[in-house]
């Protein structure tokens, strides 16, 4: 009896690790330390708040049909849209530099090299960079209809994430 769920780009409260790299990126942006717009900024991703994913997993366990796959996506947005919404909710607007994928991958390799020297694992790896370079516009209609799944709008989730970072003194 197996039901499969597929979440996309998850953000929100959680560990400060590669598995929560999107929240790390949000934190760095709000702190003024993230100035990169991947490629030309038009790459699309589906962004979903962590609590929506938790609720989606529970709904899939309770209502999901065996052998079925459910996409637990959120709002589809380009990087331009994502950072525009982040600037709005954080009330901080920074000039972002468009960085081509090959240069981003080279930077990722540099971070891996730095890990060998410091022993501290990188928060962003070449694998993460590759994964986030693809267009990932997703549709969760099946999960909405069959499971009752829903998700927070991106702006609202970003606001909750920033509030959580402030409460935990992770923001300067």
PLM features: what roles do these ranges have?
Residues 1-13:
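Conserved beta-loop-beta element that borders a ligand/cofactor-binding pocket
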Residues 19-20, 94:
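Acceptor/aglycone-binding surface of glycosyltransferases and processive sugar-polymer synthases
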Residues 37-39, 101-146:
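A hydrophobic C-terminal alpha-helical subdomain
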Residues 56-123, 159-162, 169-172:
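Mid/C-terminal beta-alpha module of Rossmann-like enzyme folds, strongest
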Residues 140-145, 152-172:
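Amphipathic terminal alpha-helices
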Residues 25-48:
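A conserved pocket-lining segment of Rossmann-fold NAD(P)-dependent short-chain dehydrogenase/reductase
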Residues 15-16, 118:
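Proline-centered turn/helix-capping motifs that create local helix->coil transitions or kinks
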Residues 4, 41-54, 63, 69, ...:
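Conserved loop-to-helix N-cap of the C-terminal "lid" that shapes the substrate pocket in Rossmann-like
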């Amino acid at each position: 009896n197996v039901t499969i769920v597929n979440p996309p780009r998850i953000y929100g409260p959680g560990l400060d690790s590669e598995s929560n790299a999107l929240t790390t990126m949000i934190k760095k942006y709000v702190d003024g330390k993230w100035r990169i717009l991947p490629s030309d900024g038009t790459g699309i991703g589906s962004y979903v708040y962590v609590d929506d994913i938790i609720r989606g997993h529970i709904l899939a366990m309770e209502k999901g049909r065996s052998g079925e796959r459910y996409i637990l996506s959120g709002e589809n947005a380009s990087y331009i849209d994502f950072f525009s919404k982040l600037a709005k909710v954080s009330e901080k607007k920074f000039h972002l530099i468009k960085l081509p994928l090959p240069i981003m991958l080279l930077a990722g390799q540099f971070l891996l090299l730095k890990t060998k020297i410091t022993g501290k694992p990188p928060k962003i790896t070449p694998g993460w960079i590759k994964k986030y370079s693809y267009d990932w516009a997703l549709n969760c209609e099946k999960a909405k209809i069959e499971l009752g799944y829903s998700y927070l709008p991106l702006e609202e989730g970003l606001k909750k994430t920033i509030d959580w970072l402030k409460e935990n003194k992770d923001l300067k």
